[in-house]
Amino acid sequence: LMENSKTERALVCPECGQTEYPKISPAVIVAISDGDRLLMSRYRVNNNPYRGYALIAGFVEIGESFEETIHREVMEEVGLKVKNIRYYKSQPWAFSDTEMIGFFAELDGPDKIKLQEDELSEAGWYHRDEIPDETMMNSIGSELKMVFKYGSLEKFYEVTGYKDQN
Protein backbone atom coordinates (compact mmCIF):
# COMPACT_ATOMS: atom_id res chain seq x y z
CA LEU A 1 0.00 0.00 0.00
CA MET A 2 1.42 3.37 -1.06
CA GLU A 3 1.71 6.21 1.45
CA ASN A 4 1.80 9.98 1.02
CA SER A 5 5.32 11.37 0.83
CA LYS A 6 6.29 13.64 3.69
CA THR A 7 8.42 15.87 1.44
CA GLU A 8 6.62 16.19 -1.89
CA ARG A 9 3.35 15.60 -3.72
CA ALA A 10 3.83 11.91 -4.42
CA LEU A 11 3.07 8.43 -3.17
CA VAL A 12 5.87 6.24 -1.81
CA CYS A 13 5.99 2.49 -1.24
CA PRO A 14 7.24 2.04 2.35
CA GLU A 15 8.76 -1.35 1.49
CA CYS A 16 10.80 -0.63 -1.64
CA GLY A 17 10.87 3.19 -1.80
CA GLN A 18 9.21 3.34 -5.25
CA THR A 19 7.87 6.88 -5.77
CA GLU A 20 4.83 7.65 -7.93
CA TYR A 21 4.12 11.21 -9.02
CA PRO A 22 0.77 12.62 -10.17
CA LYS A 23 0.00 12.32 -13.87
CA ILE A 24 -0.01 15.68 -15.62
CA SER A 25 -1.31 15.91 -19.18
CA PRO A 26 0.11 18.89 -21.09
CA ALA A 27 -2.17 20.59 -23.59
CA VAL A 28 -1.74 23.67 -25.76
CA ILE A 29 -4.17 26.46 -26.57
CA VAL A 30 -3.37 28.95 -29.30
CA ALA A 31 -4.75 32.34 -30.36
CA ILE A 32 -4.23 32.46 -34.13
CA SER A 33 -4.26 35.90 -35.71
CA ASP A 34 -4.36 37.19 -39.26
CA GLY A 35 -3.74 40.91 -38.95
CA ASP A 36 -6.69 42.30 -36.96
CA ARG A 37 -8.61 39.02 -37.08
CA LEU A 38 -8.64 36.16 -34.59
CA LEU A 39 -9.65 32.58 -35.33
CA MET A 40 -12.37 31.37 -32.96
CA SER A 41 -14.40 28.18 -32.97
CA ARG A 42 -17.23 26.43 -31.16
CA TYR A 43 -17.16 22.85 -29.95
CA ARG A 44 -19.70 20.23 -30.96
CA VAL A 45 -22.33 19.81 -28.25
CA ASN A 46 -21.51 16.13 -27.73
CA ASN A 47 -17.77 16.81 -27.30
CA ASN A 48 -17.75 19.68 -24.84
CA PRO A 49 -20.41 21.44 -22.76
CA TYR A 50 -18.76 24.87 -23.27
CA ARG A 51 -20.90 26.88 -25.73
CA GLY A 52 -18.84 30.07 -26.04
CA TYR A 53 -16.15 30.96 -28.54
CA ALA A 54 -13.05 28.84 -28.10
CA LEU A 55 -9.51 28.82 -29.40
CA ILE A 56 -7.79 25.86 -30.99
CA ALA A 57 -6.47 23.49 -28.33
CA GLY A 58 -5.32 19.93 -27.89
CA PHE A 59 -3.23 17.49 -25.92
CA VAL A 60 0.50 17.01 -26.48
CA GLU A 61 1.32 13.53 -27.75
CA ILE A 62 4.31 11.51 -26.55
CA GLY A 63 7.51 12.68 -28.24
CA GLU A 64 5.92 15.91 -29.49
CA SER A 65 7.03 19.46 -28.67
CA PHE A 66 4.47 22.16 -27.84
CA GLU A 67 5.15 23.78 -31.20
CA GLU A 68 4.64 20.50 -33.06
CA THR A 69 1.37 20.02 -31.18
CA ILE A 70 0.19 23.47 -32.27
CA HIS A 71 0.99 22.76 -35.93
CA ARG A 72 -0.75 19.36 -35.76
CA GLU A 73 -3.86 20.51 -33.86
CA VAL A 74 -4.38 23.59 -36.05
CA MET A 75 -4.06 21.49 -39.21
CA GLU A 76 -6.39 18.77 -37.84
CA GLU A 77 -9.10 21.09 -36.51
CA VAL A 78 -9.20 23.87 -39.13
CA GLY A 79 -6.81 22.88 -41.95
CA LEU A 80 -4.56 25.92 -41.53
CA LYS A 81 -0.83 26.54 -41.15
CA VAL A 82 0.68 28.87 -38.54
CA LYS A 83 3.99 30.65 -37.96
CA ASN A 84 5.64 32.92 -35.37
CA ILE A 85 4.49 30.81 -32.41
CA ARG A 86 5.02 32.76 -29.17
CA TYR A 87 4.59 31.49 -25.62
CA TYR A 88 2.11 33.45 -23.46
CA LYS A 89 1.74 31.61 -20.12
CA SER A 90 0.43 28.39 -18.61
CA GLN A 91 -2.49 27.49 -16.36
CA PRO A 92 -3.23 24.32 -14.40
CA TRP A 93 -6.81 23.09 -14.81
CA ALA A 94 -8.16 22.45 -11.33
CA PHE A 95 -10.82 19.98 -12.52
CA SER A 96 -8.46 17.66 -14.39
CA ASP A 97 -4.85 16.57 -14.67
CA THR A 98 -4.19 19.07 -17.46
CA GLU A 99 -1.58 21.81 -17.63
CA MET A 100 -2.71 24.22 -20.37
CA ILE A 101 0.12 26.05 -22.14
CA GLY A 102 -0.98 29.18 -24.01
CA PHE A 103 0.51 30.61 -27.19
CA PHE A 104 -0.06 33.25 -29.83
CA ALA A 105 0.58 32.39 -33.50
CA GLU A 106 0.02 33.97 -36.89
CA LEU A 107 -1.66 32.52 -39.96
CA ASP A 108 0.84 31.21 -42.51
CA GLY A 109 -0.85 31.07 -45.91
CA PRO A 110 -4.47 31.02 -47.10
CA ASP A 111 -7.21 31.69 -44.52
CA LYS A 112 -9.73 29.14 -45.87
CA ILE A 113 -10.94 26.96 -42.99
CA LYS A 114 -11.44 23.22 -43.42
CA LEU A 115 -13.46 22.32 -40.32
CA GLN A 116 -12.97 19.06 -38.41
CA GLU A 117 -16.72 18.49 -38.06
CA ASP A 118 -16.57 15.65 -35.54
CA GLU A 119 -14.94 18.00 -33.00
CA LEU A 120 -16.05 21.53 -33.94
CA SER A 121 -19.44 22.90 -34.98
CA GLU A 122 -18.03 26.11 -36.48
CA ALA A 123 -14.91 28.23 -36.85
CA GLY A 124 -14.34 31.65 -38.31
CA TRP A 125 -12.24 34.77 -38.42
CA TYR A 126 -13.40 37.64 -36.19
CA HIS A 127 -12.14 41.21 -36.29
CA ARG A 128 -10.91 42.35 -32.88
CA ASP A 129 -13.96 44.68 -32.65
CA GLU A 130 -16.29 41.65 -33.08
CA ILE A 131 -14.76 39.62 -30.25
CA PRO A 132 -17.18 39.64 -27.30
CA ASP A 133 -15.79 40.74 -23.95
CA GLU A 134 -15.36 37.91 -21.49
CA THR A 135 -17.69 38.05 -18.50
CA MET A 136 -15.49 35.70 -16.48
CA MET A 137 -11.72 35.82 -16.80
CA ASN A 138 -11.19 32.36 -15.34
CA SER A 139 -9.24 30.70 -18.12
CA ILE A 140 -6.16 31.15 -20.20
CA GLY A 141 -8.39 31.04 -23.30
CA SER A 142 -10.31 34.09 -22.06
CA GLU A 143 -7.06 35.92 -21.40
CA LEU A 144 -5.63 35.12 -24.83
CA LYS A 145 -8.77 36.47 -26.54
CA MET A 146 -8.80 39.67 -24.46
CA VAL A 147 -5.06 40.27 -24.90
CA PHE A 148 -5.58 40.02 -28.67
CA LYS A 149 -8.67 42.25 -28.62
CA TYR A 150 -7.22 44.99 -26.39
CA GLY A 151 -3.48 44.54 -26.92
CA SER A 152 -2.84 43.65 -23.26
CA LEU A 153 -4.66 42.51 -20.13
CA GLU A 154 -3.94 45.87 -18.53
CA LYS A 155 -5.73 47.67 -21.39
CA PHE A 156 -8.68 45.25 -21.09
CA TYR A 157 -8.96 46.01 -17.36
CA GLU A 158 -8.65 49.76 -18.01
CA VAL A 159 -11.29 49.87 -20.77
CA THR A 160 -13.83 47.49 -19.23
CA GLY A 161 -13.36 48.21 -15.53
CA TYR A 162 -13.03 44.47 -14.95
CA LYS A 163 -11.02 43.67 -11.84
CA ASP A 164 -8.59 40.77 -11.88
CA GLN A 165 -9.74 38.16 -9.37
CA ASN A 166 -6.28 36.59 -8.93
Each language-model region and where it sits:
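Cys/His-rich microdomains that often coordinate metals
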Residues: 1-3, 20
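Nudix hydrolase/Nudix homology domain
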Residues: 3, 48-52, 117-166
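Context-gated lysine
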Residues: 6, 23, 81-83, 89, ...
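Short glycine/proline-enriched turns and hinge-like loops at secondary-structure junctions
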Residues: 6-7, 24-25, 97-98, 117
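N-terminal strand-loop-strand
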Residues: 8-54, 59, 81-86, 105-109
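Short amphipathic alpha-helical patches
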Residues: 18, 40, 97-98, 154-155
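Unchanged
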Residues: 58-144
